[in-house]
């Protein structure tokens, strides 16, 4: 990068040309070490305890999409992962974001109050649902955050409809095609809720070994659980549909090549001890997306927002504040 920049200057190039070269190159620093911060429900100042917080809906051609909105500032839209509900977000992570931004979390189609009129759909359909929510709410300067499968939805939206997105955060996710590493088969069996799967097994794939015990005690207490949300289960048909679209995503080589067309500033977040989607996936995304930066958290697992809710949120806020 330095050689290219110096060559441009030597040939009479402007400082703006040099900056363009530097900004277009993915960046990656050494892993960051955050202080463990599982709250375990002890702090009652959390967004899901706010009076008047209520589930709302937008109408899409496929049916209603349910969401919650709280906080003030430029909007952050968060898309969750495989077989996940709104409750799988960490309440304190969302609360930290909401100190500076409007936070919108939604359920993917077929989950909770979000409707699915069809049983077969692809990543583009989930991206279209998110886009419809953004359009309907007339959001501007949106930061799009996708976790795990939600990061794949976010990539799809960025490739197809980037005009409403100011910047993006891809957290513990994977690129399409063969650009990264697949979820290990034994891990997928646990995440898919195979018969006999225990809560402890789920925690063992979401957290590194030294955090498992505390996660078993704190995970449910730190979940985002508004009073009107209730106990939401993921229907078997939705799980099967998501299995199918994940398979299609992994086979889509054309989409991987289209990642280079993403022009918005993108923060790629990775967990060093992610047993679900290995850090190689984040490295591949960082290499493929021109205006991306990579932050890897040491001693962190797939659900690292539960280990470091405030530090992770603050890193995202810093990215939003400094992105062009």
PLM regions and their residue ranges:
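Catalytic active-site module of serine/aspartate enzymes centered on a nucleophile-bearing elbow/loop
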Residues: 292-324
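Hydrophobic, aromatic-rich cap/lid helix
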Residues: 230-255
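Short beta-strand/loop motif that positions the catalytic acidic residue
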Residues: 262, 268-270
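Conserved hydrolase catalytic core segment
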Residues: 140-179
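Conserved HGGG/HGGXW glycine-rich cap/lid loop of the alpha/beta-hydrolase fold
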Residues: 63-113
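Active-site loop/oxyanion-hole signature of alpha/beta-hydrolase fold enzymes
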Residues: 110-145
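Conserved alpha/beta-hydrolase "acid-adjacent" motif
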Residues: 275-281
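Flexible "cap/lid" loop of the alpha/beta hydrolase fold
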Residues: 168-197
């Amino acid at each position: 990068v330095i050689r290219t920049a110096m060559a441009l200057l030597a040939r009479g190039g402007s400082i703006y040309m040099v900056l363009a070269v530097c900004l277009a190159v993915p960046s990656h620093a050494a892993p960051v070490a955050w202080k463990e911060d599982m709250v375990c429900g002890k702090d009652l100042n959390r967004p899901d305890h706010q009076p008047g917080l209520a589930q709302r809906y937008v109408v899409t051609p496929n049916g209603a999409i349910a969401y919650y909105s709280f906080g003030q500032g430029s909007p952050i839209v968060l898309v969750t992962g495989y077989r996940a509900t709104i409750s799988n977000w960490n309440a304190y992570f969302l609360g930290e974001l909401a100190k500076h931004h409007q936070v919108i979390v939604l359920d993917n189609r077929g989950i909770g109050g979000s409707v699915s009129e069809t049983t077969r759909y692809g990543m583009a359909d989930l991206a279209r649902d998110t886009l419809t929510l953004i359009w309907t709410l007339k959001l501007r300067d949106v930061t799009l955050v996708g976790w795990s499968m939600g990061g794949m939805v976010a990539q799809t939206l960025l490739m197809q409809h980037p005009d409403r997105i100011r910047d993006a955060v891809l957290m513990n996710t994977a690129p399409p095609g063969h650009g990264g590493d697949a979820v290990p088969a034994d891990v997928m069996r646990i995440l898919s809720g195979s018969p006999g799967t225990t809560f402890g097994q789920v925690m063992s794939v979401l957290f590194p070994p030294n955090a498992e015990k505390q996660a078993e005690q704190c995970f449910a207490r730190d979940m985002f659980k508004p009073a009107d949300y209730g106990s939401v289960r993921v229907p078997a048909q939705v799980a099967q549909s998501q299995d199918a679209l994940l398979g299609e995503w992994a086979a889509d080589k054309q989409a991987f090549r289209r990642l280079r067309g993403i022009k918005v500033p993108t923060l790629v977040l990775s967990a060093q001890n992610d047993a679900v989607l290995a850090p190689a996936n984040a490295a591949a995304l960082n290499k493929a997306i021109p205006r991306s930066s990579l932050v890897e958290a040491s001693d962190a697992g797939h659900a690292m927002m539960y280990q470091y809710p405030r530090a992770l949120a603050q890193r995202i806020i810093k990215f939003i504040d400094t992105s062009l």
